[in-house]
Structure formats: C-alpha cells, structure tokens
Amino acid sequence: MNLSRLFSVKSKGQAADPVSAPRSPFIVNSFGLSDRGQIRSSNEDCFVVAELTRTLQVHHSNLPQSKATFSCNRGHVFLVADGVGGSKAGEVASGLSVRNIEEFLLNTLKRSSNLQASEEQGILRDLQNALFQADARLFEEVRAHPEWQGMGTTLTMALAVNWRLFVAHAGDSRCYLYSEKKLQQLTHDHTMAAEMVRRRIIAPQDQEHHPWRHVVTNILGGTERGVQAELHSLDLHAGDLLLLCSDGLTEMVPEDQIAAILEDESDPQRACERLVAEANKRGGKDNITAIVAHIKQGEP
C-alpha cells in the first residue's frame, strides 16, 4: 500500500521552527467513556486513551545520585472504533483493529517529544500505515474465520505531541476540536449521504435525516480491501479541547449541545459523562463512545 491511497491531508498553521526556542511544556488531561446505549444488546465500540513514553529504568549503578527512572513523554494517543455489522463480528473487528494499531504504534512511532518540522510527514505516514495494516489484518482473520465475513470497523485516531495534532480517520466516527468557543469537525464522514453533500446532490441540512446517512463507504475490513486514510495535522493551543466520538453520540446530540457541554466542562471525565448521559437521555439508539482531552500549558 502506498501514499497514492491517501484520502486527504489538511493542515492548519505551521510546525514549529526546529531551531526556535522550545515552547512551554505540553500537558494533556484526558478521559474516555463507552456505553451500550438504550437499545443495543452489546457494545461494538472500542476506545483507547494512552501515552507514548520513552523510559530508562536504572536498577543498579555506581554513579552517584543515579535516578531510578528517566522518562520522556512522547505523545498522547486516542482511538475510537465502531464495529460495523450489528453482530458479534462488529465487536471483533473494532477490538482487533484497536489492538493491532496499539502494537503498530508502539513499535513504529520512535519520535521524540521535541517534534521537528521534518518529522511531520513521517508521522502522518506512520498513522496511515497503521490503518493499512489493521485493514489487512481483518481480512486475514476472515480467512481463518469465515463466519466473520464482512466484518468491519470505523477508526478515528489522534496523536497529540509537542503542541501538534495528527489525525488518521476512516468511517463516520468523528474528531472535533473545541477552541475559542467554537466546535470544529476535523474529519469528514465517509458515508453515502455525506458524499452526496460534497457532490452537491443534496443540501447539507438534508444529510441529518437522509436514509443513506448510515451507509458507510470507507472502513477497515468490510467487503472490499483498500481502506483510504484521511489525514490531518494542525496546531494545538492551551485551553483547546479534543473530542473523539462514535456516531452514537453525534446521531443523538446536536453539535450546539455538544459545544455547550464542552464549554461548561473542561474536566474530561465530567465532559464525557455528560455527553454520554445526554445521548442516552435522547434515546441512546446506538453504542455511545466519547474521548475528551484538555490541552494545557505547563510550567516553563
């Protein structure tokens, strides 16, 4: 698989000059929550909130005042996957994909926390390859388990490192940025209805209730090989909030209400709890998953 399969790359702002003075420390507080909802009998959503760190533990040394641990934070990783199929296979697909991507990132992302501008394309390429590998793994599993034929999953992944955000995405889960009291959807929905909006076949306001809004056109696994990775990179600022979520949230809770909750709750756990509760209050027709991350500036 190669870069010709790239869905899109969008950038906001510029990467820090590698020779400029380092910025203040980058702190991320985050939380994730998943709920079955009010209708479904099982939860096919999977999520991960994780940190990538580089650590050296010193057990014995004759050097004076040796520290027990030297650790450097390298990045914060967020993943949301929504299994497709409405059966046990959907749960298998989302779980397998998340575990596969965890392993890929652990073995591949060997970047320092002092991100250089020249490294950005490499990070985007790594995230893209993570989706490609997870997609291939699902088809390998189907060969071994024919009863899982057609299983698939959405996948939305974000990596926050050194005041930069990198996003890789396939499907109709979403990544949002809440900044300066504005909620911005960073990812596109890969659905038939969304594609009709992009081609100006239907108006944007008609997408919300269109019968094809749930027809996902780009996922990991499914019936056709070849997931397309939508990629983004942008600057982060102190006070920003990130939201990654499955469509079980956005189908139930309108964006103005999501923005109001994020404005009221900068604490990630409280924000997640309120978002999930609001989706359930409005019917909870699907599994509901939300990850909220609060970007802060540490002491210099």
Each PLM stretch: what is its role?
Residues 1-300:
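PP2C/PPM-type serine/threonine phosphatase catalytic domain
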